[in-house]
UniProtKB/Swiss-Prot annotation:
It comes from Koribacter versatilis (strain Ellin345). The keyword Disulfide bond does not apply. Coiled coil: none annotated. CDD domains: YihA_EngB. PROSITE patterns: G_ENGB. Its cofactor is Mg(2+). Belongs to the TRAFAC class TrmE-Era-EngA-EngB-Septin-like GTPase superfamily. EngB GTPase family. PANTHER family: ENGB-TYPE G DOMAIN-CONTAINING PROTEIN, MSS1/TRME-RELATED GTP-BINDING PROTEIN. This is Probable GTP-binding protein EngB.
Amino acid sequence: MRVLTRFMLSAADARQFPAAGAPEIAFLGRSNVGKSSLINAIVGSKIAKTSSTPGRTQTINFFEIRRPGKPRPDWIFADLPGYGYARVPKELTAEWPKFIDPYLHERPTLALCVSIVDVSVPPQKKDLELLNWLRHVGRPFVVVGTKIDRVSGNQLRNNLLKLKEELLVEEVVPFSAKGTTGHNELWKKIFEAAGTDAPATAG
């Protein structure tokens, strides 16, 4: 789906969050899981910076996303810092900047959390911890599996099944940042969660 994008700001503190407006879609995932590549793929432009250094981003980056012809943004995309890269095991929230918790817990316009997992590796404890926390605070989420191009067909099906079992979810949306697999499905989830009038085909 063609959209117009605009970088808003990078927030390193809760006081820097933009004023609540359009429905917000938060993108979360372990460091180096392909989060920025996913965001860039669905909007069709390189708005989210990719880094070869996992865990480098320590701000929430906000972007306006607008369909052509719309006077105001349809959504705000929030690119959150990656988690789970610390060498020493810690609690999930201890690895994130302190402002992440109030954003996920208190942000009034947060419509959907996109939890991004790597299908080419076994299910990770940190991903389950995140989903359990989102369940606890009542935030709607969808789990999206990236890096499907690294896994063969049969292995992909097995890995997706194992992810569903380990993460206690009914669906993991397989997604390719290099192709188009999963793009329509993810846009559909965003439209539904945000209450946006969807076109006949989202992508």
